[in-house]
Amino acid sequence: MKRGLTVAVAGAAILVAGLSGCSSNKSTTGSGETTTAAGTTASPGAASGPKVVIDGKDQNVTGSVVCTTAAGNVNIAIGGAATGIAAVLTDGNPPEVKSVGLGNVNGVTLGYTSGTGQGNASATKDGSHYKITGTATGVDMANPMSPVNKSFEIEVTCS
């Protein structure tokens, strides 16, 4: 079990770093929109920005939202490299959650990866609006023998 948990947390951390790194490939247009290489845009002045709640506490996530679709997956990155949130979903309706990386929350790196038996996640899609909910797992380095489980909710609109 410890090995599966370690793999899940490490995979989520790599996912967050990778997607956040990819999100820096942006160009700004004159209309105030950010366009990724894949053509997905996120308006920085949009009234309904991303919402991230972990363990019942609203997380103040700042930065852009970058959504790309490739190989049947929707990759969602929110925020920057240091505080980034990332998710990979299938592009079906309803989408299936493949992985979620929530980054470091109070000293615990939290994540979910399907197929590991650790945590759970589900997603709904309404147009370009996604809602991802579940339970992420992590390791508190102050007590590494005791896995940490925290509920999460992510709401984001890809445009």
UniProtKB/Swiss-Prot annotation:
Please indicate if the UniProt record lists Cell membrane as a keyword: yes
| The record's account of how the chain is modified after translation | Triacylated with a thioether-linked diacylglycerol with C16 and C19 on Cys-22 and an amide-linked C16 fatty acid. Modified by Lgt on Cys-22 with an S-linked diacylglycerol with a mixture of C16, C18 and C19 fatty acids (palmitic, stearic and tuberculostearic acid), signal peptide is removed by LspA, modifed by Lnt with an amide-linked mixture of C16 and C19 fatty acids, expressed in M.bovis.
Uses: A disrupted strain immunizes mice against subsequent infection with wild-type H37Rv as well as the M.bovis vaccine strain BCG.
Provide the Gene Ontology terms for cellular component.
Answer: bacterial extracellular vesicle; cell surface; host cell cytoplasm; peptidoglycan-based cell wall; plasma membrane
* Chain residue ranges for the region called Prevents bacterial uptake by a human macrophage-like cell line: 41-60
GO molecular-function terms, A-Z: host cell surface receptor binding
| This protein's record includes keyword Membrane | yes
UniProt xrefs under PROSITE patterns:
PROKAR_LIPOPROTEIN
Knocked-out gene: effects: No visible phenotype in culture. Grows less well than wild-type in human monocyte-derived macrophages (MDM) over 7 days; increased human monocyte MHC class II expression, decreased interleukin 1-beta secretion from monocytes and MDM. No growth in C57BL/6 mice over 40 days, even in mice lacking gamma interferon.
Q: What induces it?
A: Expressed in cell culture; expressed at a steady level for 4 days following infection of human mononuclear phagocytes.
Primary role = Based on its structure might be involved in ligand transport.
What is the designated name of this protein?
Lipoprotein LpqH
The lineage is: Bacteria, Bacillati, Actinomycetota, Actinomycetes, Mycobacteriales
